[in-house]
Amino acid sequence: MDKIEIRGGKRLTGEVRISGAKNAALPLLASSILVDGAMTFTNVPDLVDVRSIKMLLRDLGAGCEEGEGTVLIDGSGIHKIEAAYELVRKMRASILVLGPLVARFGHARVSLPGGCAIGARPVDMHLKGLKALGATITIENGYIEAKADRLKGNEIYFDIPTVTGTENLMMAATLAKGTTVLRNCAREPEITALANALNLMGARVTGAGTAVIRINGVDGLSPATIHVIPDRIEAGTFMVAAAATGGDVLVTGCEPENMGGIINKLRQTGALVEIIDHGVKVSGGKSILSTDIKTLPYPGFPTDMQAQFMVLMAISQGNSVIHETIFENRFMHVNELQRMGADISISGGNYAMVRGVNALSGAEVMASDLRASASLVIAGLVARGVTTIHRVYHIDRGYEALEKKFSALGADIKRVK
């Protein structure tokens, strides 16, 4: 099994270009199910999760052609309505095919999903929403089955904002009869990107990016060419790494307007952050200042950046409190950072008390999930000595060529068997 080996202490300098966003690409590719024709997607990242959803679409009968960063999905050949366990078990985002399948074909059978083990992340709100649109739902033998002659518009309220729930029901409602109003929606940029794509396909979606989304159903959608937006979490990861190593890095191909929570918090740590056209320049400050962090739904500080910022706080001057409000069980990286000398304690399950230390030391560590693995890479970059990260398949789920990009910035990092 692959490992990543890092010799720390190198200052990162240079320019890095950000890939397309995994969390945008997955729902966009799933939306191709809604169309009886060929969709073209550009700026698609080459990630394990993206490969998984392409494999799932192929299994349903869709045609799939790939080029450099480009994917063509032809939904005209879809003849299956079942997303099998073997294809769904590794990735929670597979649930995103449920809404499009039942909307277009009136029937869907999708295995309960897998993915990162960072909390329950139940699909209850997806199912309640589909029921409100007129689908009958049964769960049996580990599969969700949804049936409807044709979905009918309705008003749906989310108990808490849910990104995939908002996306799933927004896609389903595009082909429903009448108007659907989704309330207390998640507001992430990836949701806005999906709504924009659906509208290019002929849907009538308004309000994406706000708490209330309105969808006027149409009889059918048409093929379109869709560009995947940049990955704000990948951009944030490189920005934190630049600050942590005292480096000077230009992060290009990103959208700073979607990264306010990350940029503001990074500035509070003393880093110099300059916003340019389609990019951000980050320079490490004279010292790393401690700051408290509370994860929140967008536009607040993203939970997907919590682990990376914890490394920065671990080597800061002072103490900080990190409050995780989005997912339970998302401090699994703490034990590994402690192995490297970090002074961190957990309180109540969702608070981390971080006391800054002068330096971390290299160690053998184990990645537990996607963002935890990114935090261990940053820790390895700043640590004295050699850090070896095991179970790096987590990294490949959400970061495209991570070690190559860091190497180009001057890091001593390599993948080994």
Curated annotation (Swiss-Prot):
SUPFAM superfamilies: EPT/RTPC-like
Binding annotation for phosphoenolpyruvate: K22, N23
Keyword Lipid metabolism part of the UniProt annotation: no
Protein's name in the database: UDP-N-acetylglucosamine 1-carboxyvinyltransferase
Record GO biological process: cell division; cell wall organization; peptidoglycan biosynthetic process; regulation of cell shape; UDP-N-acetylgalactosamine biosynthetic process
GO MF entries: UDP-N-acetylglucosamine 1-carboxyvinyltransferase activity
Modification 2-(S-cysteinyl)pyruvic acid O-phosphothioketal, positions: C116
Native source species: Desulforapulum autotrophicum (strain ATCC 43914 / DSM 3382 / VKM B-1955 / HRM2) (Desulfobacterium autotrophicum)
Annotated Gene3D superfamilies: Enolpyruvate transferase domain (3.65.10.10)
Function, in words: Cell wall formation. Adds enolpyruvyl to UDP-N-acetylglucosamine.
Signal peptide: none
GO cellular component: cytoplasm
InterPro entries, per the entry: Enolpyruvate_Tfrase_dom (IPR001986), Enolpyruvate_Tfrase_sf (IPR036968), MurA_subfamily (IPR050068), RNA3'P_cycl/enolpyr_Trfase_a/b (IPR013792), UDP_GlcNAc_COvinyl_MurA (IPR005750)
Main localization of the protein described in the UniProt heading: cytoplasm
Enzyme class: transferase
EC number(s) reported in the record: 2.5.1.7
CDD domains given in the database record: UdpNAET (cd01555)
